[in-house]
Amino acid sequence: MNNTTVRIATRKSALALWQAEYVKAQLEHFHDGINVELVPMTTKGDIILDTPLAKVGGKGLFVKELEVAMLEDRADIAVHSMKDVPVDFPEGLGLEVICPREDPRDAFVSNTIKSLSDLPQGSIVGTSSLRRQCQLKASRPDLDIRDLRGNVNTRLRKLDEGQYDAIILAAAGLIRLEMSERIAQFIEPEEMLPANGQGAVGIECRNDDATIKALLAPLECATTRIRVLAERAMNRALQGGCQVPIGSYGVISADGKNIHLRGLVGSVDGSEMIESEITGPVEEGEALGNKLAQELLSRGADKILQQVYSENDIKNS
């Protein structure tokens, strides 16, 4: 029996609560008698819905309140979508566990159109992501890309009301919320490179909390960690915040020995796109991510990102 209580800081959205409940169930599975409590809270990113994410501080807005709760000992762990987690952590906190990854692809969602390629000229497509906007405009400059904020249900409601012809969401969120029937098309990484960590759930805790770390250990997925840390290393080396047109995606070979990592940096209007890829031993995943970033920088990625930051008034956090 384990009489320990673990308090999970979580946002209140349906998807965030699903992730927290998943971690709760896993902890209860591995530790008989453990007491797990959810501590739901509202983040700044949940409140400011009338401004594009990039202009109000990127996706770090969705984790800061949860981190403060841990530092003030109001919670023991925080559960995050890895694509929302900034590459650097506050002093005293760290990424302890990365859980098994769900489908990392983006999803094309429409009530009337079957796929991205079937969109009529000038169609209105909703997304809050500059990464998605960049890649959409590169392949389909005719599309009218409009900002789309809110939780999954809010975004789907806006689509159903006719505000958009289609919207792009992370497939993982729809699958987890048992809404995969809303997905008209899974967009392959070759067509739209995902965000670093997309589809993965991470668990953050205090670095000095040995008891919590021991309890979390069975939830770790080693292969997901290799992939996600390689992707995040590329993002860190590019000094890219969560809300910039950067895509990165790692795949481990069938024999488990190598990782193939792809990355891209583009302008928001899709007129410029720099892409590259690299393969090497899984043990060198983060080094490969750094190397891939240097390759992109040597080809002008830094100039594109500087322009993106200035033109879009992006706060890099």
UniProtKB/Swiss-Prot annotation:
The modification S-(dipyrrolylmethanemethyl)cysteine is found at C242. Its EC number is 2.5.1.61. Binds 1 dipyrromethane group covalently. Its cofactor is dipyrromethane. InterPro entries: HemC, Porphobilin_deaminase_cofac_BS, Porphobilin_deaminase_N, Porphobilinogen_deaminase_C, Porphobilinogen_deaminase_C_sf. It catalyses: 4 porphobilinogen + H2O = hydroxymethylbilane + 4 NH4(+). Monomer. Belongs to the HMBS family. HAMAP family: Porphobil_deam (MF_00260). Tetrapolymerization of the monopyrrole PBG into the hydroxymethylbilane pre-uroporphyrinogen in several discrete steps. Keywords: Porphyrin biosynthesis, Transferase. GO terms for biological process: protoporphyrinogen IX biosynthetic process. The porphobilinogen subunits are added to the dipyrromethane group. This is Porphobilinogen deaminase. GO terms for cellular component: cytoplasm. Pathway: Porphyrin-containing compound metabolism; protoporphyrin-IX biosynthesis; coproporphyrinogen-III from 5-aminolevulinate: step 2/4. One of its GO terms (molecular function) is hydroxymethylbilane synthase activity.
